[in-house]
């Protein structure tokens, strides 16, 4: 194998003792140069496609930027494509730079979604959205593209939402009739309130509260059935979209049904409660009457005992009267005759002798 001319001349001019060292150094140098060429070729082939795309589209992303993204662990393909989309769409925001895209990517944002949202806002011509606002919305956890689309094309929210435990909003008019309502709320995203503003759940809760209040203030449920638009107007006047991420465009009553007669049910429950109270009061009075009757029977028994005690003293009194001469034998028989006449008259008059009355002791 023929050696190169320069290496041959160098070897011929050097002493024979130094030839092995020079050969080793040349080989090492050749390997280093070869490795460098391989690395350069690898880098060139890896980033040439992205670089040529950026050059042809006017995105102005240099090789140095591409290599730096790799060392910073940034997805170069996502950054280049996002920058190309922004350039082709004519986004002229001065804050929309390669460094800003890298920073948003490293912060955990969705770069391509932000660029798509900016392009959609620019095409709509009615939405003012800057790159800073779009990245802030994206980092706040909101879908910035969906928000822009909702701002352009209003979104319909069911109230109550589909799949909820209660299929309708129940409210009672002043006449006591229950109405079951389902509404549809058309909202448009408010990009200025999207960060920190309330979400769909708040809109649903506020609209439900407004519908219940509007029905509750109606004097007659028939008026609500005849003109459901009364509910929508009453709810829209309250500005329920304040401090929310949406702007309410319209509230439409999708369905309204008549429920139970809550007023009659409440009256029946009240009547039942009044009946229970009256029954309890009557039971109390009956118990008091029974107690009073028992007390009277006790008084009667006490009086009868006193009568029996007094009757037991009569024979002793008569004996004492006989001994003292105050009562003679003829007087006693005369008294017995009068008592017998009295008993006979009672018998003739139909009055039986009271068995509880003790007989007089002779």
Curated annotation (Swiss-Prot):
InterPro entries on file: FloA
Segments passing through the bilayer: 24-44
Alphabetic keyword roster: Cell membrane, Membrane, Transmembrane, Transmembrane helix
GO cellular component: membrane raft; plasma membrane
Domain of life, per lineage: Bacteria
Subcellular compartments: Cell membrane; Membrane raft
Annotated membrane topology: Single-pass membrane protein
Primary location group: membrane
Job of this protein: Found in functional membrane microdomains (FMM) that may be equivalent to eukaryotic membrane rafts. FMMs are highly dynamic and increase in number as cells age. Flotillins are thought to be important factors in membrane fluidity.
Quaternary structure (record): Homooligomerizes.
NCBIfam families: PRK13665.1
Family: Belongs to the flotillin-like FloA family.
Descriptive protein name: Flotillin-like protein FloA 2
